[in-house]
Amino acid sequence: MAPLRFSANVSWLFPELPSLPARLRAAGSSGFEAAEVGWPYGEPPEALARTAQEVGLQLVLINTPPGDREKGEMGLGAVPGRQAAFRDGLEQAWVSSGHLLEVRSIPVKDAGAKGKRGLVCSAEFTRLEMIHLMAGRVPQGADRAAVRDEMETVFLENLRHAAGVLAQENLVGLLEPINTRITDPRYFLDTPQQAAAILEKVGRPNLQLQMDIFHWQIMDGNLTGNIREFLPLVGHVQVAQVPGRGEPGSPGELNFPYLFQLLEDEGYKGFVGCEYQPRGEGGLSSRPGPGEGALEGQVSGRGCFPPRGLRCLGFLSPQETR
């Protein structure tokens, strides 16, 4: 059974650092092997790919653009009347992913080429794999039940289009249910059951489920049953403690050592994204001592740093976030 692999969500972690490249460097120096970025569109994608490459990080996930944040938009995939804007945003994400895919090698001196520059392939550090296709919110003032069918129809149409676009670069599109009890009361896609039903209707193999354990616990609980039921559809996992959306080491409802073991036992092979609000900056607050080899890793003020496929230390417990 392979140990879990962790990715740093640099839109959440290292908040004391002002730029995404700086956060990527911090993630690399903290022992992460991968990173994900919510909305990378304020930075040149080549710069992000180059930084990730320099510190040995694989970039695994970005989101489609949120739309007009000033008007309260948080994704456009299921929003009636915004189909063209969703497709424009998908194109923007796809173009960004193309840049991240292109920066696959670094120049090095080729000793046998009389000073000419050669290339060493490092695609494993830069290849973007997944794009979260954000569903968006129920329109302001609309009744959720009244617009549900229309929004699902729009979402299905957009997802079929997205699947075709993403297939051109062998990318996977992800659907993430976001809880409507605490985080986003108007978000359209809010349970794994709803997302799984939509995936079945779309019927595209490169569309999968994004399991954020924080949201799933808030909406439905029953994490053991839901993980076992839906894991075959899952392409990516994210974690945070409930209800405070802190790191797995903070007080809360979730028993993360158990959940991480469950994911391993069920054969999950993807990354576990650390998407939480860190308690502090810098410095390790705890390290495994002698005889704790089965729980290899580090725990810091920011939570779990897994340089060797960390399963969080036995005393940890989790919290929530989007």
Where are these regions (language model features)?
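Conserved beta-strand positions in the central sheet of alpha/beta enzyme cores
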Residues: 36, 60-63, 132, 174, ...
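Active-site-adjacent beta->alpha loops and helix N-cap segments on the catalytic face
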Residues: 41-54, 254
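Aromatic- and glycine-enriched glycan-recognition loops and surfaces
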Residues: 21, 40-42, 88
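Active-site acidic/histidine proton-transfer and metal-coordination neighborhood
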Residues: 53-54, 58, 74-208, 218, ...
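Short, conserved active-site loops that position catalytic residues or coordinate cofactors/metal ions
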Residues: 26, 30, 61-72, 134-136
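Histidine-acidic metal/acid-base catalytic patches
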Residues: 2-31, 53-56, 92, 113, ...
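Active-site-proximal loop/turn and secondary-structure-junction residues that shape catalytic pockets
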Residues: 12-14, 39-41, 65-68, 135-139, ...
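A short beta-strand-loop structural module common to alpha/beta enzyme folds
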Residues: 32-42
